[in-house]
Amino acid sequence: DAGMEAAVRLLLNRPESTISRSDVWGLNTLTITERTMFEGDSGTTTIVTVTAQQGDATLEQEISAVGKESPLPALASLHDLQYFDSLQAFSYSTSPTANQAFTDFSGIETMSHLERFSVNGARPETLEPLSHLSQLKQLSLTECGTLDLTPLEGLDQLESLILSSNDRIVSLEPVTKLPALRSLSLSSGTAVPSLEPLAQTHLAVLDLGLGVGQSGLYKEIDYSPLSQLPDLVCLNLTNHTRVTTKFCKQILAHSPDLRFLNIQNTPASEGSALDVEYLRA
């Protein structure tokens, strides 16, 4: 893949000479970040940063270009990761514009030892390649359009799942097949058809925080499953305009371990008398 090759060449400061497997096999983490900065009268600059961890050493290189065009080819494939024999974590992010060419996660299935996988700003057609990552503990897919989580069923080691800022999740039913899952984020405007499957989970952390003006996404949603999460420790309901004091009391009654409840900009936060003193302990 031209995008992956360019990123690795930048990281290794190897613009032309041959790159062999031995050059990358010892890398434990690889992070590729592309961001466009709007600087007013100074114009627009696009910056790509590539970072890697190799044992206790950190490698980092950066390249920039004037304008919205990336100084490196866009990432379109993960097949080259098969050469990173020691890789435990991979992260790719592009903002504020999504990489429309990054639609295929094929190639990642060879990385059965991967523990952390994070992608922001792609448009994956399917998550099936991720189903082979049996050691995956943390998964983040943000600004990735519409996602069908079905292929994630059976990832027995997955503890944290971040699905913020997506257009839509087809169904939350697959999260009930993730026995180790303790943290789930659906914040910043990710639409879901129902919260009912969450009642079958053992979540400790649930982030449903919305941005200003996004409350309409939950206009028809039944909130009652949130009062059926006995293991809950942290819950974010920011900007949910249908969350009342009465409902918050139901949550507190059924979640004895709850220590943090964010109800900013909800009816429950407007002069209500929630009995939440013990949450501050």
Task: Annotate each PLM feature.
Residues 20-21, 25:
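Short, structural beta-strand-to-alpha-helix junction motif
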Residues 28-107, 113-129, 135-151, 157-174, ...:
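Concave beta-strand-loop units of leucine-rich repeat
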